[in-house]
């Protein structure tokens, strides 16, 4: 059994082959407040009829207290590319396994595979470390601690700090998914504790804006279907009058600020891909908690319009009292099509009575919506950027 090692960039995707086409690295540099990552690739040559080899990895370095090792695992990709609509840069065009999840290594124990590559994600996150060049030595042994191979990496820590991110960086962190994964009920103390941990990691990886579920976000949901209720605004209907309570929204804002969030992306007021319906909104009516709007609601119905007018006025008052109104962004509906232009205009007019045009952001692939001034701040799908770039759109956002 022979173990061959190779150090590669964190940007590389390491598949099962011998990794011969991937450039090797031996050194790197980082600013004092950055996190630096690279990969160690282990390829086992063997004639033994054995697919798994329990082994061990050991880190030797002055930086060892600040180094984490994770094993790169694989997940199936059934449609990695659309045939007829792809360039030559795809790493995988047929169904197969691709590297993605990172699994923490416990007590240095790792799993290698016979005649295949396995990669390990090395993360360096120094705290109060003097600037300089540090050697990181990585040793591989079998489970009985017999030496197999070793290599080393030189990391320079530069006496300077990465400045605060000068752009907006948001992501859709869905509370219902977190609740399901951890088998907790949304809104419980346990849920809020788990949510805080996710938020801190979210900020650590460069996000400064967060999707805020005023009502259950109408996102990635089949028509007629609904996501688990995740609603920060409490709605009551007393004798035909709407009452709005923002206690949970304040708790959310306070938590997000404490974790380092600066900007708030308010959830969409209309459904995706056409803006034809209202999002799922729950309310308590005479003691009964029930859905009052959803897929059955025409987005331009008088009932929903009146609700929005009552709600938006109270929401804006609350956000101003919290002194974050200028740090908030609002959605009408994502990805409207040309045939949705009139519908979108009417819905946006409702919102414009309460917020600035520049605070309204929506995912957009149709350049004509921007050209006509319908969407002032488009968030463009990265595969539809070209016309926006060619026409010199300033302050352009993008998503993928």
Regions found by a protein language model. Give the residues of each.
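Surface-exposed binding patches on compact interaction domains or structured appendages
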Residues: 2-19, 46-121
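Short, polar loop/linker segments at the starts of domains and inter-domain junctions
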Residues: 14-29, 184-191
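Contiguous beta-strand segments within globular domains
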Residues: 25-46, 211
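Extended acidic/polar, glycine-enriched regions
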Residues: 42-50, 107-166, 192
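Aromatic-lined carbohydrate-binding surfaces of glycoside hydrolases
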Residues: 94, 135-142, 149-354, 365-372
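Extracellular glycoside hydrolase catalytic/binding regions
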Residues: 357-385
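Active-site clefts of carbohydrate-active enzymes
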Residues: 391-400
